[in-house]
UniProtKB/Swiss-Prot annotation:
Pfam families: FlgI (PF02119)
PANTHER family noted in UniProt: FLAGELLAR P-RING PERIPLASMIC PROTEIN FLGI, FLAGELLAR P-RING PROTEIN
Keyword Signal: yes
InterPro entries listed in its UniProt record: Flag_FlgI
Name this protein carries in UniProt: Flagellar P-ring protein
Source taxonomy: Bacteria, Pseudomonadati, Pseudomonadota, Alphaproteobacteria, Rhodobacterales
């Protein structure tokens, strides 16, 4: 039984050693293997009275006239203002090595004052890249991300009904010319540049090929010599190295989102010894004017007399909290929670701690 337990521990040791490892293809971008952004504008039709008000969005009428004329319908001088049409921008990402005839997902977003794209159909829309060439053509039924309804005195909106997607809604009509097989050097661009991580990638790749085929050029680039790998093609090299496991060096970073009050801190965040006190002062001023009328049968005018109510509120009982030297993430969280403050107040506290030089991490505000 003891021997079986020992063998089981030996089997699990490699798994524990690789616990923090990440696949190489999740850490780097392969030079030349990249997608391209596409954009176009067109019309969504078939809306149930939730389209653009053509008086407020005249470009919708212009787009509609151009499309109808291309279809052989002469609308010159005609005055038509349907409410079931909306002008939209169409965006898509053309993946690397996409071939003619393959389909890609697209996103549709209203340009004008359309209330909802729910149930509409995008009619044939060319999608251009930055070079002005058409690489795909989009068409299909829009899947909106919300719903809206309105009456004479009230309206309700859930989600974002003016934006939606069309899965496989565009067909590729032109390929991006890139000859991967002609590469003699393959560069790996780190998504999070770091000298330690780049050095580990160099070591891991050289170990996989039992030779010196990779060289770290800087914190964001590792270069491979294709000939030294003795592989049949650069594609075979990528296929061989993309699943190599590497443990990245994580930076100490605090990211806060002021709009949502979200705070995310890495495990390596450290804080020097600091004392924190937080309180809030609320000043409320309310104007409530009153009308003073003259007595009956008396000469006089009605006078509006201003009346102001002012009050100040201060939260009592908020104490001073001390965070010890070289505190870890759990110490930081415990110290902030000891103040009993909201996430938005915590953001202000972290900003102040960073300004005081006690927060030893990159501070990112979004």
């Amino acid at each position: 039984m003891t021997l079986i337990r020992l063998l089981a521990c030996l089997l699990f040791l490699p798994c524990l050693a690789q616990a923090g490892a990440v696949r190489l293809k999740d850490l780097v971008e392969f030079d030349g293997v990249r997608g391209n952004d596409l954009v176009g504008y067109g019309l969504v039709v078939g809306l149930n009275g939730t389209g653009d008000g053509l008086r407020n969005a005249p470009f919708t009428e212009e787009i509609m006239s151009n499309i109808l004329e291309r279809l052989g319908v002469n609308v010159t001088g005609e005055d038509f203002r349907p409410k079931n049409v909306a002008a939209v921008f169409v965006t898509a990402a053309l993946p690397p090595f996409a071939r003619v005839g393959s389909q890609i997902d697209i996103t549709v977003s209203a340009i004008g004052d359309s209330k909802s794209l729910l149930g509409g159909t995008l009619i044939m829309t060319p999608l251009n890249a930055a070079d002005g060439q058409i690489y795909a053509v989009a068409q299909g039924t829009v899947l909106a991300g919300g719903a809206s309804a309105e009456g004479q005195a009230a309206s309700v909106v859930q989600g974002v009904p003016t934006s939606g997607v069309i899965p496989a809604g565009a067909r590729v009509e032109r390929e991006i010319e890139f000859d991967l097989g002609s590469l003699t050097q393959l560069r790996l661009a780190l998504r999070e540049p770091d000298f330690t991580t780049a050095g580990r990638i160099e070591t891991a790749v050289n170990s996989a090929f039992n030779g010196r085929v990779a060289v770290m050029r800087d914190s964001g680039t590792v270069e491979l010599d294709i000939a030294a790998t003795q592989a049949r093609s650069p594609a075979h090299v990528i296929g061989r190295i993309e699943n190599i496991l590497v443990e990245p060096e994580r930076k100490a970073r605090v990211v806060v989102d002021q709009r949502s009050g979200t705070i995310v801190m890495g495990a390596d965040v450290r804080i020097s010894r600091v004392a924190v006190s937080q309180g809030s002062l609320t000043l409320r001023v309310e104007e409530a004017p009153i009308a003073v009328q003259p007595n009956p049968f008396a000469d006089g005018d009605t006078v509006v007399v201003p009346r102001t109510n002012a009050e100040i509120e201060q939260e009592p009982g908020i104490k001073l909290a001390e965070v010890p030297e070289s505190a870890s993430l759990s110490d930081v969280v415990a110290g902030l929670n000891a103040l009993g403050v909201s996430p938005r107040d915590m953001i202000d506290i972290l900003k102040t701690i960073k300004a005081a030089g006690a927060l030893h991490a990159e501070f990112v505000v979004r």
